[in-house]
From Swiss-Prot:
Binds 1 heme c group covalently per subunit. This is Cytochrome c. The modification N6,N6,N6-trimethyllysine is found at residues 80, 94. PANTHER family: CYTOCHROME C (PTHR11961). The keyword Ligase does not apply. It is found in: Mitochondrion intermembrane space. Pfam families: Cytochrom_C. Gene3D superfamilies: Cytochrome c-like domain. GO terms for molecular function: electron transfer activity; heme binding; metal ion binding. Electron carrier protein. The oxidized form of the cytochrome c heme group can accept an electron from the heme group of the cytochrome c1 subunit of cytochrome reductase. Cytochrome c then transfers this electron to the cytochrome oxidase complex, the final protein carrier in the mitochondrial electron-transport chain. GO terms for cellular component: mitochondrial intermembrane space.
Amino acid sequence: ASFAEAPPGNPKAGEKIFKTKCNQCHTVDKGAGHKQGPNLNGLFGRQSGTTAGYSYSAANKNMAVNWEEKTLYDYLLNPKKYIPGTKMVFPGLKKPQDRADLIAYLKQSTA
């Protein structure tokens, strides 16, 4: 199912998902350093593999994904299938509602 068919996202629910599943490796705080994964501030509209100061895999740089709701929705289903060779070890969020909620939170928190 594509993002066009996704349920409406709830940013509050997405924040809980971020804190339990993403926060260990990522931050959304402007000006914060990178963790194991890159800082996600300014994520929307950015190309994959381009955050200054973070060492990305060649796969992530070469894929040149433009991060928007649609691409994140597909990526978060199965990151290793979407970008083979990515360093992200997260297996993905299988439930469409979880992905929609997380994207709604990221849209708010990374702007």
